[in-house]
Amino acid sequence: MPCNYLFYMLSKNQLKLVQKLSQKKHRSETGLFVVEGKKSIVEFVEAGYKAEVIYATDTFSASLGQQRLTLVSKEELSKLSTLKHPDEGVAIFRQPKRKGILQEGLILALDNIQDPGNLGTLIRLCDWFGIETLLCSEQTADCYNPKVVQASMGSLSRVEVHYLPLAGFLVTCDLPVYVATLAGENLYTTTFPEDCVIVLGNEANGVSPEVAALANGAITIPRFGKRQQAESLNVAMAGGIIVSQIKGKASEGSQLGM
């Protein structure tokens, strides 16, 4: 069936709305956020996100079936896009209402992660390893920041991101909590329960003392270099190593139990 096209030029108000949504204040007030790129837009649509408007070139339009589109030229699209090389589409989606937090399985928690690229990568990490719940302190970067959305490569559409007073949640949490530090137990010799929370801290300062005080244990990725001079790992890289180790051990255990 043909797509339902709308053919008209972009107005100043349309351009302004997309530009304003780069600011957290306007995203919070409107409940909207911007997604760029064909792949990501399609994934948000398939995940059931409500699209307020999709600006698409004619080369992209056939991929979206019955979605209501605003067909634009590549020149117009470049006015909307923040990318150096705009990718066929820019969409405005409505932020979903989050469900309650399910306290089971491996949960990743972020304590004041500031860099949008790191947050987007950690969201992709959760998606890759099947972690459905990502907890963020209220000081952590906004997951609907266009840079975070772009870095997540569509994975934000499949991961439940919850913002909350992290310490307050951990006080009442029924799961054991492990914080990643530079002076914890060796990650590779630690046995983790199937259900637990792993906390990653701020890029410069690590996990806050308030959150660290609530942990059941602290873990660290040991350095293997002879000189032992590397100061630290990027938080997204560290998160990948930790989650991969935990999931790998769990996979080995399930295979042994077969």
What are these regions (language model features)?
Residues 1-8, 252-258:
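N-terminal amphipathic/basic-hydrophobic helices that include classical n-h-c signal peptides
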Residues 2-58, 140-141:
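Boundary-proximal intrinsically disordered activation/regulatory segments immediately upstream
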Residues 37, 114-122, 230-236:
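Amphipathic alpha-helical repeat scaffolds
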Residues 46, 100-183:
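RNA substrate-binding interface of SAM-dependent RNA methyltransferases
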Residues 64-75, 105, 176-177, 191-197, ...:
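Active-site regions of enzymes building and remodeling cell-envelope glycoconjugates
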Residues 69-94:
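Glycine/small-residue-rich loop that forms an oxyanion/phosphate-binding "nest" at active or ligand-binding sites
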Residues 128-129, 143-155, 212-258:
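Structured adenosyl-cofactor binding patch, chiefly the S-adenosyl-L-methionine
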Residues 179-229:
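Active-site/ligand-binding-proximal alpha/beta "capping" segment
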